[in-house]
């Protein structure tokens, strides 16, 4: 049939490209129409040979085994006959074809040539009116319902038609799709092969004609009715072949752009509704998309280019609902909505998330990845390193190497550091939190009581630290990181001398013949994305290093290395 579709002319619609048993629109090709799927076709060839068969006596091919009816006016006076070029030279008795029998055979042969088949054996339904049939009479109607794959499908039709004697009254073929007892027009004007031939073969005008409209069926079966609007029997001579019922349901696709971005930054979810290749009008389709938890819709951002359609975003429920139309000749249209997420991760939307789909084929999957800052919150009560022995970290707490919120805390009652000294209770915690506004905070705390080092050279009732890294969320993603760090000193004494509770950061005290002590040590880390605060950092000449009450807080990117504890 492909050859027949080149140069097809249209009355009822634009040309029908690629009609055949091709698959319906497949997801993944937004904006590129695919051929409509053939639901039913009748070529009037089942069991036919040289003999002439009246339309009511014909049964179509299995599994449908379709039969046909017509108004009496279209079953008499040389009408309603299945004819081929190989039919007998004389018409069957009682068909009243007079001297026009050969013309019936010529039209069947011309339709066979047009379709790229065998002109001699091709059968067509012919009508060479030798009387006035009257307007609006049914020339062909399916008797058995044609099953559909599902409800809420757009249906269209296609037919090969021929006509002779175009100098007088033309056949005017009006096709209807039957929805239960209702006949629904799938055209804007009747097919007139005389006025719009795809080709003239031996004096016979022929063409393939597709509906420029479509019918949205809610049921699971359909029928076809051909009504000839020409009342006169003067002229009105024609034939039809290759009647097709087409599932011309548009394809829905969905895509995110950009598909990878920071949390808080907006991405656009685009729904593309792509017509089938006959480009008939598709009015009244609709669907609702349910987005996964974690995505935040911009309720005022929904928009559509789909005719007089509407697009609405329900931010509270995470749904997008679209109603729209495709005009005749329109390849596609779109609906868009903006959204974001304050939680890092990959979110996928698939066809299973589309509910209340009417007149669209479900899409494939689309995904978007939001990259989130990574929490790095760590603390410990004490750690000792030396050339011979390491102790700790003791009472370590950590919430690190994850974009997800969480917390950790630990404590011990006391700690011994060998010849270096003793400590009382150690308590620590570390956490990562996400605010309702999307801001992220990494925080850590450490407290060490009962400090007694180097035989009383360094003592304190309590030392503690806190570290925090906070990052707000802006309309374009994570903002600048704010770092804070503090040290608590209660009755700290070094060599019997009291140290101010508000000692400045990185206060260093030399310990002659012993080493040095840094108080309220504050060190930026991760290229300024974090801070480490240590209450007491003791370095001995023997190579021993002790950190007491240390807290670290940072907000890292996904490309930063995961920190050691």
Question: What kind of feature is each model-predicted range?
Answer:
Residues 178-193, 286-321:
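A surface/secretory-pathway sequence property marking extracellular, secreted
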Residues 182-217:
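Extracellular carbohydrate recognition and processing domains
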Residues 26-105:
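Extracellular carbohydrate-recognition regions
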Residues 136-138, 229-248, 359, 545:
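Extracellular carbohydrate recognition
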Residues 263-283:
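Short beta-strand elements of extracellular/lumenal beta-sandwich folds
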Residues 77-151:
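Surface-exposed, low-complexity/disordered Ser/Thr/Gly/Pro/Asn-rich loops and linkers
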Residues 138-145, 206-213, 323-346:
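Low-complexity, intrinsically disordered segments enriched in Ser/Thr together with acidic residues
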């Amino acid at each position: 049939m492909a050859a027949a579709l080149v140069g097809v002319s249209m009355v009822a619609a634009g040309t029908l490209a690629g009609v055949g048993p091709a698959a319906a629109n497949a997801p993944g090709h937004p904006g590129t129409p695919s051929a409509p799927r053939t639901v039913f076709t009748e070529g009037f060839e089942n069991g036919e040979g040289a003999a002439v068969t009246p339309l009511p006596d014909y049964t179509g091919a299995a599994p449908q085994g379709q039969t046909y009816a017509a108004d009496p006016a279209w079953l008499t006076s040389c009408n309603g006959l299945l004819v081929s070029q190989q039919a007998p030279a004389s018409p069957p008795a009682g068909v009243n074809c007079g001297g026009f029998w050969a013309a019936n055979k010529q039209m069947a042969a011309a339709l066979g040539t047009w379709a790229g088949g065998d002109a001699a054996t091709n059968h067509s339904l012919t009508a060479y009116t030798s009387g006035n049939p009257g307007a609006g009479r049914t020339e062909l109607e399916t008797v058995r319902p044609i099953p559909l794959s599902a409800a809420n499908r757009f249906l269209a039709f296609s037919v090969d038609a021929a006509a002779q004697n175009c100098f007088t009254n033309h056949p005017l073929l009006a096709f209807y799709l039957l929805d239960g007892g209702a006949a629904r027009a799938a055209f804007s004007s009747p097919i007139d092969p005389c006025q719009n031939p795809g080709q003239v073969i031996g004096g016979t005008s022929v063409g393939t004609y597709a509906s420029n409209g479509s019918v949205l069926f809610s049921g699971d079966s359909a029928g076809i009715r051909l009504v000839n609007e020409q009342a006169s029997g003067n002229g009105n001579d024609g034939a039809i072949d290759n009647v097709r019922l087409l599932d011309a349901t548009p394809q829905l696709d969905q895509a995110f752009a950009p598909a990878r971005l920071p949390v808080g930054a907006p991405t656009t979810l685009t729904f593309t509704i792509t017509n089938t290749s006959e480009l008939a009008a598709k009015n009244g389709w609709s669907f609702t998309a349910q987005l996964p938890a974690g995505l935040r819709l911009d309720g005022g951002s929904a928009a559509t280019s789909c005719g007089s359609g509407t697009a609405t975003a329900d931010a509270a429920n995470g749904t997008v609902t679209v109603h729209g139309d495709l005009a005749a000749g329109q390849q596609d249209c779109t609906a868009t909505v903006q959204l974001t997420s304050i939680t890092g991760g990959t979110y996928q939307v698939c066809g299973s998330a589309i509910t209340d789909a009417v007149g669209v084929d479900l899409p494939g999957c689309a995904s978007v990845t939001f990259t989130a800052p990574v929490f790095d919150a760590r603390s410990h009560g004490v750690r000792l390193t030396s050339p011979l022995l390491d102790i700790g970290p003791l009472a370590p707490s950590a919430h690190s190497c994850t974009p997800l919120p969480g917390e950790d805390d630990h404590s011990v009652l006391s700690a011994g550091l060998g010849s270096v000294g003793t400590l009382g209770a150690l308590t620590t915690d570390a956490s990562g939190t996400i605010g309702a506004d999307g801001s992220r905070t990494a925080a850590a705390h450490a407290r060490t009581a009962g400090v007694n080092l180097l035989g009383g050279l360094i003592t304190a009732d309590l030392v503690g630290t806190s570290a925090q890294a906070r990052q707000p969320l802006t309309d374009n993603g994570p903002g600048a990181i704010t770092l804070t760090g503090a040290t608590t000193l209660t009755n700290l004494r070094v060599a019997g001398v009291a140290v101010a509770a508000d000692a400045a950061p990185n206060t260093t005290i030399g310990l002659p013949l012993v080493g040095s002590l840094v108080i309220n040590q504050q060190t930026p880390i991760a290229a300024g994305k974090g801070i480490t605060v240590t209450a007491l950092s003791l370095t001995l000449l023997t190579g021993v290093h002790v950190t007491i009450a240390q807290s670290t807080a940072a907000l890292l990117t996904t490309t930063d290395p995961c920190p050691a504890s």
